[in-house]
Curated annotation (Swiss-Prot):
CDD domains: AAK_NAGK-C (cd04250). Pathway: Amino-acid biosynthesis; L-arginine biosynthesis; N(2)-acetyl-L-ornithine from L-glutamate: step 2/4. One of its GO terms (biological process) is L-arginine biosynthetic process. The gene is argB. This is Acetylglutamate kinase. Its EC number is 2.7.2.8. Substrate binds at G82, G83, R104, N197. GO terms for molecular function: acetylglutamate kinase activity; ATP binding. Keywords: Amino-acid biosynthesis, Arginine biosynthesis, ATP-binding, Cytoplasm, Kinase, Nucleotide-binding, Transferase. The keyword DNA-binding does not apply. It comes from the Bacteria. It comes from Prochlorococcus marinus (strain SARG / CCMP1375 / SS120). The record marks K47, K260 as: Transition state stabilizer.
Length: 304
């Protein structure tokens, strides 16, 4: 286990009002203790994306949260997207983007940019950020060691958009066992050697199932799943798997939230204990969701 200094730094940097006394911090630590004990030695798969990737202050908060999870004995595994950065480079190179059902239509020119950005830039920035705050991260993509076998999405009309055919968890098990934090980008190859862009939420769900994760956590730009999209106070804090399917059928969950909800459903159906959709725009959202009684987002479970 890494130095406990990370745990102290993480708690000290929680978003408490200036001047709050030591009793508040003791209360925070006391509330966190049973969760720290519960998740020691458990795998927590985190899909890192949205505004938490683009704002420097949020980036550091996420990296510290991840380091703290590792410091207290949990085993985080990070899956990342990179949509804003991909959009930036596509615009810069005058390549048009098209989305359908929350997925980016990917031709060969777009795929070149996706690979460059996700594997060459974003992945290494995340690894460096986690390493900088005292943990030890290792960057991978689905191609490495045949970690993820891809196949075309649907009927192939999405271009080089893929889905997960198989996960070879043996590639990352030694890293996890030795205290490293795998950081995985969602580019993978088919058995024919064709590279595909896979939705990072989907990859996170399949990785979580393959490694027997306790939790799957998706960092998003929403507060969670809302009963009414126009009412931020209509957050659903806890929901059963069967009720989640009903929300999709009734199109209460739609658009870009659909692949997130579906990946949570698939992960739970394959044995993951809980899935969480939380607001990555809130500093230290991970700690607030994992180590507090109330949490801050939507938790999906197989049963009550």
């Amino acid at each position: 286990m890494k130095s406990n200094n990370l745990a102290t730094e993480g708690i000290n940097s929680l978003p408490l009002d200036h001047g709050e006394n030591d009793a508040i911090r003791v209360s925070v630590l006391s509330e966190a203790l049973p969760y720290i004990q519960k998740f020691a030695g458990r795998r927590i798969v985190i899909k890192y994306g949205g505004s938490a990737m683009s704002k420097e202050s949020l980036k550091e908060a996420v990296f510290r949260d991840i380091a703290l999870l590792s410091s207290v004995g949990a085993q985080p595994v990070i899956i990342h997207g990179g949509g804003p950065e991909i959009n930036h480079w596509l615009t810069k190179l005058e390549i048009k983007s098209e989305f359908r059902d929350g997925l980016r239509i990917t031709d060969s020119n777009t795929m070149d940019i996706v690979e460059m950005v996700l594997i060459g830039r974003v992945n290494k920035q995340i690894v460096n950020g986690i390493n900088k705050v005292g943990a030890s991260a290792v960057g991978l993509c689905g191609i490495d060691g045949k970690l993820i076998e891809a196949r075309p999405w649907g009927d192939g009309s999405y271009g080089l958009v893929g889905e997960v055919a198989r996960v070879n968890a043996d590639v990352i098990e030694p890293l996890i066992a030795n205290g490293y934090i795998p950081v995985i980008s969602s580019v993978a190859s088919s058995v024919e050697g064709i590279n595909y862009n896979i939705n990072a939420d989907t990859v996170a769900g399949e990785i979580a199932a393959a490694i027997g994760a306790e939790k799957l956590i998706l960092l998003t730009d929403t507060s969670g799943i809302l009963k009414n999209k126009s009412d931020p106070l209509s957050l659903i804090q806890n929901i059963r798997l069967s009720d989640m399917r009903e929300l999709i059928d009734k199109e209460v969950v739609n658009g870009g939230m659909t692949p997130k909800a579906e990946c949570c459903i698939r992960a739970l159906a394959q044995g993951v204990n809980a899935a969480h959709i939380i607001d990555g725009r809130i500093p230290h959202a991970l700690l607030l969701e994992v180590f507090t009684d109330k949490g801050i987002g939507t938790m999906i479970v197989s049963r009550s």
